[in-house]
């Protein structure tokens, strides 16, 4: 599956999708080799229907690699040189594209959200397991060292005690009301909706810090959600601002989460956690690219833990972790196991039911 360059293994990647996220992922994969513990090479790039676009992406974003360009996904997944495919198409396409790759015996890393709903995700996980293939959702923040540091402070050192009040906000001003009606962000059939686009980040932070608390004993929270919604040009309903409250009875903790495409970030700290002992923990940066932890004790003493970097975006943590999984013949990543992906999909399905947002993919699993 891998080849050798001297004494170092090389992981060969194929890209299914050549958009803006793929460009950033490619830059981190091969543009900052000093950041990596494993060697990576992009050997193939495909778009759904344009070899020219694939070739242009390869030339503009994959140097020093010289990947083969394909004008269809079907061609790339049959390329024997590819060890793993990275899928960055829009999320309504994930189910079909992941399934195509798995049926052609390719290991898969697929951008978040893995699918539109839980039944799609479950089917893909079961397919990967049946074919004994590595498969992971590309939720890159789970691989950041800052996440491990925050969990150590809270779950092992118990710096904020045992009962938490968590606030997380991920909001950006897309001038939503001014977007053209045919914009992807305003077309539900194309995956429009802030919950799946952005809201999964605050939800993930709540699971990392509250759900994963050993004292919670893996008990799922109660969920209450509200949203501001819009009607698209097809008459479908999507959400553009959504608020979710999660209550964890086992630890008497609560998470209040907000996400919006119609408001900008209010402060440098996207996350605040109040502890029962008066201590507070803040995480600054972006919800998807955290930079530092600040612990303010009730006494006024402040500690800052810096994890900032400016030479890359931050995908390299995920990329190396996935490579290590392949080299060790692991079938899922410990940072984002299949069980957690499925539980997150169940959670977003539950929230969507509460805010009355559905997608065409949901209709495949609706029974009379």
Swiss-Prot record:
Cellular compartments annotated: Cytoplasm; Nucleus
MF terms (GO), sorted A to Z: D-xylose 1-dehydrogenase (NADP+) activity; nucleotide binding
Annotated Gene Ontology cellular component terms: cytosol; nucleus
Annotated Pfam families: GFO_IDH_MocA (PF01408)
Highest taxon in the source lineage: Eukaryota
InterPro entries xref list: Gfo/Idh/MocA-like_OxRdtase_N, Gfo/Idh/MocA_domain, NAD(P)-bd_dom_sf
Catalytic activity field: D-xylose + NADP(+) = D-xylono-1,5-lactone + NADPH + H(+)
UniProt-listed SUPFAM superfamilies: Glyceraldehyde-3-phosphate dehydrogenase-like, C-terminal domain, NAD(P)-binding Rossmann-fold domains
Enzyme Commission code(s) on record: 1.1.1.179
Keywords: Cytoplasm, NADP, Nucleus, Oxidoreductase
Gene Ontology BP term (one): D-xylose catabolic process
Protein task: NADP-dependent D-xylose dehydrogenase catalyzing the oxydation of D-xylose into D-xylonolactone. May also display activity with other sugars. May play a role in the regeneration of NADP(+) in the presence of these sugars.
Stated family: Belongs to the Gfo/Idh/MocA family.
Protein name: Probable D-xylose 1-dehydrogenase (NADP(+))
Lineage: Eukaryota, Fungi, Dikarya, Ascomycota, Taphrinomycotina
């Amino acid at each position: 599956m891998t080849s050798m360059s001297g004494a170092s293994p090389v992981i060969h990647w194929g890209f299914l999708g050549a958009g803006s996220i793929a460009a950033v992922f490619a830059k981190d994969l091969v543009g900052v080799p000093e950041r990596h513990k494993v060697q990576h090479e992009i050997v193939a790039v495909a778009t759904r229907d344009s070899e020219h676009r694939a070739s242009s992406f390869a030339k503009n974003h994959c140097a020093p690699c010289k990947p083969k360009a394909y004008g269809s996904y079907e061609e790339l997944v049959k390329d024997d040189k590819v060890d793993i495919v990275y899928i960055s198409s829009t999320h309504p396409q994930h189910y079909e594209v992941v399934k195509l790759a798995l049926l052609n015996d390719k290991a898969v890393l697929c951008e978040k959200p893995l699918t539109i709903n839980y039944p799609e995700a479950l089917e893909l996980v079961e397919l990967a397991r049946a074919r004994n293939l590595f498969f992971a959702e590309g939720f890159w923040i789970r691989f950041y060292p800052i996440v491990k540091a925050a969990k150590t402070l809270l779950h092992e050192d118990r710096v904020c005690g045992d009962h938490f009040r968590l606030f997380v906000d991920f909001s950006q001003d897309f001038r939503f009301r001014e977007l053209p009606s045919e914009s992807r962000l305003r077309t539900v059939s194309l995956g429009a909706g802030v919950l799946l686009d952005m809201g999964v980040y605050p939800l993930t932070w709540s699971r990392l810090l509250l759900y994963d608390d050993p004292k919670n004993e893996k008990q799922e929270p109660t969920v209450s959600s509200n949203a501001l919604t819009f009607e698209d040009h097809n008459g479908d309903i999507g959400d553009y601002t959504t608020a979710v409250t999660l209550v964890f009875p086992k630890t008497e903790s609560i998470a209040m989460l907000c996400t919006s495409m119609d408001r900008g970030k209010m402060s440098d700290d996207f996350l605040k956690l109040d502890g029962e002992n008066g201590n507070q923990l803040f995480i600054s940066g972006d919800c998807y690219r955290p930079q530092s932890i600040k612990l303010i004790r009730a006494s006024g003493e402040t500690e800052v833990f810096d994890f900032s970097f400016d030479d890359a975006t931050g995908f390299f943590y995920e990329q190396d972790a996935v490579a290590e999984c392949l080299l060790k013949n692991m079938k899922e990543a410990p940072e984002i196991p299949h069980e957690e992906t499925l539980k997150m999909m169940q959670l977003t399905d539950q929230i969507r039911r509460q805010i009355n947002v559905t997608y065409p993919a949901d209709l495949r699993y609706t029974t009379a």
